[in-house]
A protein has these predicted regions:
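An N-terminal hydrophobic leader/cap segment in hydrolases
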Residues: 16, 20-66
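Membrane-embedded segments
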Residues: 69-137, 151, 155-156, 160
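Acidic catalytic loop of the alpha/beta-hydrolase fold
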Residues: 89, 220-224, 251-252
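Short alpha-helix in the alpha/beta-hydrolase fold that links the catalytic acid
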Residues: 96, 202, 211, 225-234
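Alpha/beta-hydrolase fold nucleophile elbow
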Residues: 142-152
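Hydrolase active-site cap/lid region
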Residues: 155-211, 258
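Short beta-strand/loop motif that positions the catalytic acidic residue
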Residues: 209, 215-221
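C-terminal catalytic histidine-bearing segment of alpha/beta-hydrolase fold enzymes
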Residues: 231, 238-272
Length: 272
């Protein structure tokens, strides 16, 4: 009687474990498929801010060149080009423009296709086309030896811009070595290298960039931990580079740091 009861219990346990394994496998596959088809939704977070109705850039021209939109302020024949992160819009970054205006650079704040109420879905291919259009605009208008600034996701288009040439300085804030590395560190159970289409590989893009490179990163950054920018920094052969870790600041508040402000201003004060 007892052995029969034990056999029934073992049968129930085996059935439970089998069902649990099947459910786990189905869940794994389901989330895998969801990530494949919706990965852009996990990377890009645009808002519906209207590009033309931005109060923060009232004193800038609103330009559109080959479907690439940007805010532009004419200054010297050296330009500073700003590429923002993955959330919100360029309009949100108007608070930081004062850092760049003291040196009378011509200033460009780039808006990505798919952002600021644009109906296109953001994607790497189109964002790189935005970069190419900005690069052509700079060349056409004789804006040379420029400063390129990219923050977070913006380090990808900024690095691509640097790879196209005519960049005297590159400033990267909270960057990663590659999007592939970043996502692998967050989603360890999936073969990201197989399924990721939106890989911004800054390590490769900057392999031949040898001009000035400044990397700033908050020591308390949880979204893109500082070891990602350290890997980028250490993996580049460029000898004209600097990596500054700003302790006690994270991903979204780094720009409030006095060290951040001083580092940016000092960098811009050095003539190209």
């Amino acid at each position: 009687m007892k052995s029969k009861m034990n056999a029934n219990i073992n049968k129930i346990v085996r059935k439970f474990l089998k069902n649990l394994l099947v459910a786990t496998l189905i869940t794994y596959i389901l989330f895998f498929v969801i990530f494949i088809f919706l990965q852009k939704s996990f990377i890009y977070f645009p808002d519906d801010q209207d590009f033309k109705d931005c109060q923060g850039f009232l004193d800038y021209e609103k330009k559109t060149i080959s479907n690439t939109r940007f805010y532009f302020k004419q200054g010297t024949d050296n330009a500073l080009i700003y590429y923002h992160g993955n959330a919100g819009s360029t309009c949100d970054r108007s608070l930081i423009k004062e850092f760049f205006e003291e040196n009378n650079y011509s200033i460009i704040f780039v808006e990505y296709t798919g952002y600021s109420n644009d109906q296109t879905k953001p994607n790497k291919e189109q964002i790189f086309k935005d970069v190419e259009n900005i690069h052509k605009f700079l060349t056409k208008n004789n804006l040379n030896n420029n400063v390129v600034y990219g923050q977070s996701l913006g380090s990808g288009p900024a690095s691509y811009h640097a790879s196209l040439g005519n960049v005297g300085k590159l400033i990267l804030v909270s960057p990663f070595s590659s999007m592939r590395d970043l996502i692998k560190s967050k989603i360890k159970i999936y073969p990201v290298s197989i399924i990721l289409t939106e890989d911004y590989n800054n390590q490769d893009l900057l392999s031949n960039y040898n001009n000035r490179l400044l990397i700033l990163h908050g020591g308390e950054d949880k979204q893109i931990p500082v070891h990602h920018s350290r890997k980028l920094y250490e993996g580049l052969k460029n000898t004209n580079k600097e990596h500054i870790i700003i302790e006690n600041f994270g991903h979204d508040d780094i720009w409030l740091s006095s060290i951040f402000k001083k580092s940016i201003l000092d960098e811009l004060n050095i003539k190209l």
